[in-house]
Amino acid sequence: MNYITAVITVRSGSQRVKNKNLKIFCDKNLLEYKIEVLKKVKKIDEIIVNTDSDEAIQISKNYNIGYKKREPYFASSECPNSEFWKNIAENTKSKFILFTHCTNPLIKKSTYEKFIEVFEKNKNNHDSFNSVTDVKEFLFLNKKPLNFDPSKSPNSQDLPNVIKLNFAINILTPSLMAKKKSLIGDNPFFYNLDAEEGYDINTKLDFEFAEYLFKKNRSQTEL
């Protein structure tokens, strides 16, 4: 059995940016970039693309990596994330899953390797490892402030250390993922990514800005 299997999920029915995982980003599509980075990462034993897209399957074959054809329901908007994650776990045979997305295209090879190093050092004390990003913003829920007192409004840099899951890199066992129907365990280790590497593409504007950042960084760093 493999020790760490990287799973990339690609569905053809993305809503806000049509077919974004296979959309040309600079000079390749997002899936191709992600595969090329992961193939260089030490300690990843296998890469599997879990998808309903025939084009993504063909790309997987071109790169000589594994793929799993996803059933239509699990690629639909009707399928909640909880069922989707359980299905991914049940269809991945490995001691650990490294779950990652094409839509975080700015993560470097070295960051994946550092994440795995942290996982190896702390795996006996935590059951999931999840990347996060700091949020230094004035937040409200139901018209009530969440992280500040409006009568004593601080400078933004002095706001509490709130973090958000960015779902860019996650490691856990398939059994825990299936049981919890989640990427988050009972005792997670949160690994902080800077805002740039944790940047996630959800909208057309996100796509265009990520492409700008990628082009800017390409001559300065290995991606």
Give the location of each predicted region:
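Short internal beta-strands
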Residues: 47-51, 131-132
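Conserved SAM-binding loop
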Residues: 23-24, 49, 99, 199
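N-terminal nucleotide-binding beta1-loop-alpha1 segment
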Residues: 1-18
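Conserved core of the sugar-phosphate nucleotidyltransferase
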Residues: 84, 105-197
